[in-house]
């Protein structure tokens, strides 16, 4: 089983890919898809589309976990929703099953509290994946937490 966790955004899309082998969680890759702020929005969305397709073609995940987006009154809301739409379209085009989780659900599953701090979530991710160093940048650590939430839901702790 191989899962990709995705933390949506327009400027940065965090991703983390975990494989289960002999009941052990193995971190295969994590990072961010960064889009240039100097580019037009449609070009940034296309960059997410292209780079996510390449990642999926390379790693062939069997399932995906994506953070749910809640509407806040913010100037970036529509851009993030558009980026999330591109992400969901790529996953659907690859016939990858998608599970969605709220930030509170992720924190509760990973760190034991729906109000856990970023550090508490990061520590739990590092413990679960037996990492010596924290994944950088933060968006990739968040994506790993999202993937771990899906694994936990599937009974893989």
From Swiss-Prot:
Belongs to the RuvC family. Its EC number is 3.1.21.10. GO terms for molecular function: crossover junction DNA endonuclease activity; DNA binding; magnesium ion binding. Binds 2 Mg(2+) ion per subunit. One of its GO terms (cellular component) is Holliday junction resolvase complex. Coiled coil: none annotated. This is Crossover junction endodeoxyribonuclease RuvC. Pfam families: RuvC. Homodimer which binds Holliday junction (HJ) DNA. The HJ becomes 2-fold symmetrical on binding to RuvC with unstacked arms; it has a different conformation from HJ DNA in complex with RuvA. In the full resolvosome a probable DNA-RuvA(4)-RuvB(12)-RuvC(2) complex forms which resolves the HJ. InterPro entries: RNaseH-like_sf, RNaseH_sf, X-over_junc_endoDNase_Mg_BS, X-over_junc_endoDNase_RuvC. Mg(2+) 2 binds at residue 67. PANTHER family: CROSSOVER JUNCTION ENDODEOXYRIBONUCLEASE RUVC. It catalyses: Endonucleolytic cleavage at a junction such as a reciprocal single-stranded crossover between two homologous DNA duplexes (Holliday junction). The RuvA-RuvB-RuvC complex processes Holliday junction (HJ) DNA during genetic recombination and DNA repair. Endonuclease that resolves HJ intermediates. Cleaves cruciform DNA by making single-stranded nicks across the HJ at symmetrical positions within the homologous arms, yielding a 5'-phosphate and a 3'-hydroxyl group; requires a central core of homology in the junction. The consensus cleavage sequence is 5'-(A/T)TT(C/G)-3'. Cleavage occurs on the 3'-side of the TT dinucleotide at the point of strand exchange. It is found in: Cytoplasm. GO terms for biological process: DNA recombination; DNA repair. Its cofactor is Mg(2+). Keywords: Cytoplasm, DNA damage, DNA recombination, DNA repair, DNA-binding, Endonuclease, Hydrolase, Magnesium, Metal-binding, Nuclease. It comes from the Bacteria. Mg(2+) 1 binds at residues 7, 139. It is an enzyme of class 3 (hydrolase). The active site is at 7, 67, 139.
């Amino acid at each position: 089983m191989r899962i990709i966790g995705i933390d949506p955004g327009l400027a940065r899309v965090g991703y983390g890919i975990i494989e289960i082998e002999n009941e052990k969680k193995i971190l295969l890759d994590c990072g961010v898809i960064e889009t240039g702020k100097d580019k037009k929005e449609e070009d940034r969305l296309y960059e997410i589309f292209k780079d996510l397709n390449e990642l999926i073609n390379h790693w062939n995940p069997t399932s995906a976990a994506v953070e749910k987006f809640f509407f806040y009154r913010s100037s970036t809301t529509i851009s993030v929703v558009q980026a999330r739409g591109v992400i969901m379209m790529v996953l659907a085009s690859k016939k990858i099953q998608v599970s969605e989780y709220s930030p509170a659900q992720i924190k509760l599953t990973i760190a034991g509290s729906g109000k856990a701090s970023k550090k508490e979530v990061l520590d739990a991710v590092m413990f679960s994946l037996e990492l010596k160093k924290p994944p950088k940048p933060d968006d990739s650590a968040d994506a790993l937490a999202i993937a771990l939430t899906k694994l936990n839901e599937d009974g893989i702790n």
